Amino acid sequence: MHDDRSAIAHAAADALERGRADGTLAATPALAGFDGFIDSIIRVVDRRRSMRMDDFDAIGTIPGFAGRVAAAAGKSANIELVVEEDRFGGNGPLYAGALGRLGMPTTYLGAVGRDDASPELLPIYEPFAARCEEVVPLAAPAHTDALEFEDGKIMLGKTAPVQAVTWERLVERVGLEGLRARCARSRLIGIVNWTLCGGVQGIWEGLINHVLPTLGEQGGEAAGPKAPRPEGMERRRRVFIDLSDPAKRTDADLRSALEVLRRMDELVPVTLGLNLAESERVARVLGVEAHADAPSLGESLRDGAERIRARSGFACIVIHPREGAAAAHRDGAGAWFEGPFTARPRLSTGAGDHFGAGFSFAQVLGLPLEQCLAVGCAVSGAYVRDAESPDLARLIGFLRDLPRAEQ
């Protein structure tokens, strides 16, 4: 199994090397949207050693933080938060920024503006824009306080500004023909954060009704001879969707969203990316058992991905817990890949977005399913270790020397 893991990772690295060398990667554009957040990366103070701002012991775990909050019931508490840095954020910018850093020509449309009415980019997004081929602000960003712990993170979101991102605003800013042209040249269309952006479902509907039926099958095409592709994994246009933690949305909302995406899949193959909790929720709404008893986590998640895929009707379902990732494809392919989990990440906010970027990046390049999983895990694994998005050289090197999961 470990030898297979290494062989898959090396094969993925070889494929990416070829894609860079023959120009395929540079001729595989992406379009992504539509949110935008400013993420404050925060540690929660447990005990101060002095009043120097960085001289403290942080609360290490989410249960430890929960206990501190619970102890204040019926009383009061003052919990100190130390902002380590402000970063450009939002599921969309993190996803698109990861694609751009890997060398994919990327257009981003989203809530990254100086204010709601301005077409100017907010300065904090300038490093993000430098990774992209084009960035079009649609509104001002929302704000997230990201409380980082050793065992996860708690995201406290203030989402009012991103509600301005709607189908009407999108067409107003880029024009219907401009949107069609951007989609027509894109092999990958990535749409994330349905949960917090009330206008995203309307954008899906607008794309289904006014854009996707007008597109050719392929999207941007690289010149030169093409290597044979596995059945069902050919290089064609794909849509990647990440709902982004729909726990706060009702079952009726989620059922409606899945039905819209089913209609989208009739026009362009849809891949739905889910973390473990999201997969359980989606399975429940669809009326299927997510993860039945199986000899291993990998088998359980692979089987669960296929059950969700079969019931949803989507081209591909990918599930990415911390331990690795599993996927099922319409062509009958199914796979599990053990990830390079680290117990002490330098940064965890954005890990899921980086997995989605890596997986969808590999998918539109035509890699086999298990290699797509390896690339997704490697992009995320490098990101949480380095606290920055990997470029293609870092990704290839990481795949060639992929760490074992830490216990």
Which residues make up each language-model segment?
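Ribokinase/PfkB-type carbohydrate-kinase core domain
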Residues: M1-A73, V82-N91, G100-G334, L367, ...
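Intrinsic disorder/low-complexity segments
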Residues: Y95, A222-A227, P345, C377
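Short, small-residue alpha-helix embedded
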Residues: L99, R281-R284, P345-L369, L373, ...
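Short glycine/serine/threonine-rich phosphate/pyrophosphate-binding segments
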Residues: N91-Y95, G356
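Short pre-catalytic strand/loop immediately N-terminal to key active-site residues, enriched for Gly-Thr
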Residues: V83-D86, G339-G350
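Conserved glycine-rich phosphate/nucleotide-binding loop
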Residues: F337-R344, A362, R400-E406
